[in-house]
Amino acid sequence: MDASMWIAKTGLDAQQTRMSVISNNLANVNTTGFKRDRASFEDMLYQNLRQPGGQVGADAQAPTGLMLGTGVRVVATEKTHTQGSLVTTKNALDLAVQGDGFFQIAQSDGTIAYSRDGSFKLSPTGQLVTANGALLQPAITIPPNVASISIGQDGTVSVETAAGGGAQVLGQIQIARFSNSAGLQAIGQNLLKETTASGAAVVSQPGQAGAGKLMQGALEASNVNVVEEMVNMIETQRAYEINSKAISAVDGMLRFLNNNM
């Protein structure tokens, strides 16, 4: 009986974790460039009471085994890197990656993090930065008193000054790609960190070597589907209730034994 309660408890723990993942997805439904997470489960070790094909008589073998499971556990949470819808903002510093790739963001410790959030701002020195002040890499500095800023699909940044004289190219934004984007580690602030599972970043010009193109004046919305998450929430709630009822049923069986034995 104790084993049954323990198995049901693992089910409660697993569904609680899944509910946390779903809640985080829904909380970030309006977060620019956010990628939804999903929880993956696996069954735990089995108690092998009889091996399949084992001897059950003088001349007979068991066609099946007798193996009792010991529950379930969450084995991973994984980001789903599907394209979010593009929202037009008409802000010259807003960028969206249409396709595969991430913006490169410099961290205070000198490392590079990666993001799909292209809502950039100008720092006091004219550099392109995130909402938290982290520098976009390669660094782009916009001179003062520009009349317009143009960012091409290939990442080329050019400006026109109020004095005229034609477009002046300032540099080119490059994006990074990974062989296994699901292996990136989320670190908050819309940032992801390279890991051994993700593989090394492959930096290239937008639109080249499989990299996505840039779209100026637009942002990528979260790829969270609210209806899908609500369905997942109901499924999780029902699974949690079923495991809770299993514990109650085992408790009733134990109570019956105590009262009648």
Each language-model region and where it sits:
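Amphipathic alpha-helical polymerization modules
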Residues: M1-M261
